[in-house]
Every structure is written in structure tokens, then in C-alpha cells.
């Protein structure tokens, strides 16, 4: 698991107490190397990162996602966010409106399928 990540907090809080050996890594690519070499059985990591950084590459062939997506608010909060300067209410409204608009028809799905084998928007 990537050191300092929300996935590490989840792993330490939920998996380690259940008897899973959790190994924190400084960089995600080190995790992939140890999975390939057989030193790790798996990882808890950001789905978009794993897809782009490993599964979509030749070295990721034969590997895939298992288990349910993790949405525990205690560890992961209420979704992703976009950083904006305070007081940028119009920009925030415009971004939220644009997201809502492309999700209201099939535009979002078409764009998403071009880049991902899953829905990165989540639940």
C-alpha cells in the first residue's frame, strides 16, 4: 500500500486488525514490482492509478481488480474534490453545472469509456 495514502489508513485500520500483513511503500511503482515478483499478493490502491499505472501496461497483463470498490467515509470521505481559491463561487457553480450536464445524458459515458475500463465517477 502507498505510504501516507487513504488506502494505507484503511489497510491499517481494517485489514491489519483482521490479520492481513500491510506493507507500506514509498512509491506505487514499487508495489507493482513486488506484485510482479510474487513478494506481494495484492494491494489496496487508487483505482484510476492502478488502471493507468499498471493494468493498462504490458506488465499488468494477467492482473485485474478484485473485490468491491471501497467507499468507507471514515477513510475516504465523501468522494473526490477539486481545489479552487476561496470566493470562486461562479467557477464552482460552472464546474458543478458542467459535470451535472454531461452526466445527464450519454456524453460522460462516451468520454469515460474512451479512457477507462470502469466508471471513475464511482457510486
What label would you give each PLM region?
Residues 1-123:
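Proline/Glycine/Serine-rich low-complexity intrinsically disordered segments
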Amino acid at each position: 500500500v502507498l505510504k501516507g495514502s487513504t488506502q494505507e489508513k484503511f489497510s491499517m485500520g481494517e485489514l491489519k486488525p483482521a490479520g492481513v500483513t500491510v506493507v507500506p511503500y514509498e512509491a506505487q511503482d514499487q508495489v507493482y514490482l513486488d506484485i510482479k515478483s510474487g513478494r506481494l499478493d495484492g494491494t489496496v490502491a487508487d483505482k484510476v492509478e492502478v488502471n493507468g499505472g499498471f493494468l493498462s501496461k504490458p506488465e499488468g497483463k494477467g492482473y485485474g481488480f478484485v473485490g468491491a470498490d471501497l467507499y468507507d467515509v471514515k477513510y475516504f470521505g465523501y468522494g473526490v474534490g477539486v481545489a479552487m481559491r476561496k470566493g470562486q463561487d461562479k467557477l464552482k457553480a460552472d464546474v458543478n453545472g458542467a459535470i451535472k450536464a454531461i452526466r445527464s445524458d450519454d456524453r460522460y459515458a462516451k468520454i469515460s469509456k474512451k479512457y477507462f475500463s470502469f466508471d471513475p465517477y464511482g457510486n
